[in-house]
């Protein structure tokens, strides 16, 4: 029993021990299981994360693969972006520049248009300013001589004008050659015609009034330039726009010139443009005449020869004698050159004419000073009053000094150097005005030369110039007459031309054979110019006295017609010419020409028959002859006064012209 009990107890103890041991193992297994579960969870989470990462990586891989397939890397993308930005900036700046350029271009075009409009306005204003001035003078002054020399300012405007002026002259000359005598009368009308009260200035004439054209018209035959310049006016294309200085005797222009109406503008309105047609053909012939330029200009610029010196009054015989000797000394170099000494005298006279013409602009002031002038020159009231409108004889001491110097210089041959007293000064002025009634270019043609020697000087033609005669001063191509140089009386051109009305009035008592100035006033009808151009003879508005043979110069030389002086230049052309061609416009209807060798003839150098060929023969009208030849008529009167009178000096200046030019 005890043994069994003991055995049972033992068994229970062993069973409990075993159970405890198994429980411990179970607990250990459970713990391990829990740990494994945790690990599994951790691994699962990790696995999940890894899968997600794998997905992202795959996506990245795809993107990279796509980029590789596109061929652009990150750098390329950046570079491309930068390039795009730069291109955009460049394009924007370019557009801005284009806009600015467009704006500036528009502004420039606007400025150009405005400039053009301003230029047109200036031209129009100048035209308006130039036109009224000659018209204003119409009422107060008699028609000036057809050959008016420009004032010093005018000379500058003329010579400095661009070469275009010369080209225009050539074109006009060609036009004259083609149209012949059919050229519009407006181009042939002399300035007298334009200036006369009856005449009107056509608007279309504005382009024809360039200073170059005027210079060609006035100086195509005789070049009056500065001592240094060698180009003749015909050759000279002044560089529209600005003119060469006046070489003439007007060294210091008196204030009267400045205050007076500008001769340049006056000439623009009064000068026919056609006168410039001479320029192309005259240039070779004018070259010879240019040889006189230096001595002339040097003489003119000498302190003694200044016409404006107030001290030189015509009443002082010593001044007259001194200037006459100076003129002689100055004349010698030209004779050494083989050129006629008379030509220099002609230039002096022409310059004198220019000075008087400039003074003519002072007519109103001249009237005011007329009282002061009379004591000096002692001119009769009859002479003074006619000259006042022209302002030629009444300008005061300056003008008289000028005339004294010019008269003395006019003694180109030095043949008459006697001083002129106050009485002689009066006669000299009258003679100068008559001689230059119509300034006419000299005819250098052979026939003109021969005719000039034999021709009588029509005393009455001076005043009786028909408008045709005045207009024949219009340029005609020098084909037949060559460059037409004016005789000394003709050269006194402007001055004497301005005196012309005065002289005609004053000289009518002196020279009965000379018609009244009224006949010369008729020079300016435009209609007459048309008749001239068409070649139809114009009946002289006033009866023209028959040409009266003038007594030969005191030297015994008949005064050469202007044609004579021009003869050498146009020998070839003149052979074809017939005396008939010389018929003056006024005497055109009368046909006052005779054979060249017949002896004294009325050489009406201006002929419509020649038409354009005698472009320069503005003065080539019997009136111009009158200016020269009537001077001979006046010389008759003055010869009685005294062979040494200033008139003789002026009258004799042309006589040298005939022989020297014939020799040349």
UniProtKB/Swiss-Prot annotation:
Pro residues bias spans: 241-255, 537-552
Residue spans with biased composition (Basic and acidic residues)? Answer: 125-140, 437-454, 554-570
Compositional bias annotation for Low complexity: 516-528
Provide ranges: composition bias, Polar residues: 481-496, 584-597, 654-664
Pfam (any one): CtIP_N
**Bias (Basic residues):** 628-637
Name under which the protein is recorded: RBBP8 N-terminal-like protein
Give me the Gene Ontology terms describing cellular component.
extracellular space
| Organism the protein comes from | Homo sapiens
Annotated region Disordered: the residues are 125-284, 369-664
């Amino acid at each position: 029993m005890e043994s069994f009990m003991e055995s049972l107890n033992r068994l229970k103890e062993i069973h409990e021990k075993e159970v405890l041991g198994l429980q411990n193992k179970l607990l250990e297994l459970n713990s391990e299981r829990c740990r494994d579960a945790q690990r599994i969870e951790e691994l699962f989470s990790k696995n999940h994360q890894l899968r997600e990462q794998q997905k992202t990586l795959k996506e990245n891989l795809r993107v990279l693969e796509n980029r590789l397939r596109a061929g652009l890397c990150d750098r390329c993308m950046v570079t491309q972006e930068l390039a795009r930005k730069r291109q955009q900036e460049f394009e924007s700046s370019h557009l801005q520049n284009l806009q600015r350029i467009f704006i500036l271009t528009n502004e420039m075009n606007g400025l150009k248009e405005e400039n053009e409009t301003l230029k047109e306005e200036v031209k129009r204003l100048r035209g308006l300013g130039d036109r009224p001035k000659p018209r204003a003078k119409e009422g107060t002054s008699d028609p000036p001589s057809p050959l008016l020399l420009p004032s010093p300012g005018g000379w500058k405007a003329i010579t400095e004008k661009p070469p275009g002026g010369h080209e225009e002259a050539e074109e006009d000359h060609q036009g004259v050659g083609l149209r012949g005598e059919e050229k519009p009368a407006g181009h042939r009308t002399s300035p007298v015609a334009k200036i006369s009260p009856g005449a009107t200035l056509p608007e279309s004439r504005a382009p024809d009034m360039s200073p170059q054209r005027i210079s060609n018209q006035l100086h195509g035959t005789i070049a009056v330039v500065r001592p240094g310049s060698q180009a003749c006016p015909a050759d000279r294309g002044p560089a529209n726009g600005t003119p060469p200085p006046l070489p003439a005797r007007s060294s210091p222009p008196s204030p009267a010139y400045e205050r007076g109406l500008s001769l340049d503008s006056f000439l623009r309105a009064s000068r026919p443009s056609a006168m410039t047609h001479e320029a192309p053909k005259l240039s070779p012939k004018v070259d010879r005449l240019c040889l006189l330029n230096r001595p002339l200009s040097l003489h003119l610029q000498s302190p003694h020869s200044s016409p404006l010196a107030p001290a030189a009054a015509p009443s002082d015989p010593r001044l007259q004698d001194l200037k006459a000797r100076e003129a002689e000394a100055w004349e010698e170099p030209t004779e050494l050159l083989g050129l006629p000494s008379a030509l220099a005298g002609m230039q002096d006279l022409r310059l004198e004419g220019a000075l008087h013409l400039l003074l003519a602009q002072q007519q109103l002031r001249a009237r005011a000073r007329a009282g002061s002038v009379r004591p000096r020159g002692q001119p009769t009231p009859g002479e003074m009053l006619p000259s006042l409108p022209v302002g030629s004889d009444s300008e005061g001491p300056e003008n008289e000094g000028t005339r004294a110097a010019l008269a003395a210089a006019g003694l180109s041959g030095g043949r008459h150097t006697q001083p002129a007293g106050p009485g002689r000064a009066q006669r000299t002025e009258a003679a100068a005005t008559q001689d230059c009634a119509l300034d006419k270019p000299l005819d250098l043609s052979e026939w003109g030369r021969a005719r000039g020697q034999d021709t009588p000087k029509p005393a009455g033609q001076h005043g009786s110039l028909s408008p045709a005669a005045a207009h024949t001063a219009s340029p005609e191509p020098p084909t037949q007459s060559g460059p037409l140089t004016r005789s000394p009386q003709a050269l006194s051109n402007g001055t004497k031309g301005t005196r012309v009305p005065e002289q005609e009035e004053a000289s009518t008592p002196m020279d009965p054979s000379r018609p009244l100035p009224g006949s010369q006033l008729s020079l300016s009808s435009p209609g007459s110019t048309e008749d001239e151009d068409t070649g139809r003879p114009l009946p002289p508005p006033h009866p023209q006295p028959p040409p009266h043979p003038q007594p030969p110069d005191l030297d015994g030389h008949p005064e050469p017609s202007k044609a004579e002086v021009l003869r050498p230049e146009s020998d070839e052309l003149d052979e074809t010419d017939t005396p008939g061609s010389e018929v003056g416009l006024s005497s055109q209807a009368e046909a006052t020409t005779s054979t060249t060798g017949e002896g004294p003839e009325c050489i009406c150098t201006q002929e419509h028959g020649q038409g354009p060929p005698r472009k320069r023969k503005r003065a080539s009208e019997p009136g111009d002859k009158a200016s020269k030849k009537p001077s001979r008529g006046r010389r008759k009167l003055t010869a009685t006064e005294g062979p040494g009178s200033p008139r003789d000096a002026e009258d004799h200046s042309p006589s040298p012209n005939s022989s020297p030019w014939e020799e040349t």
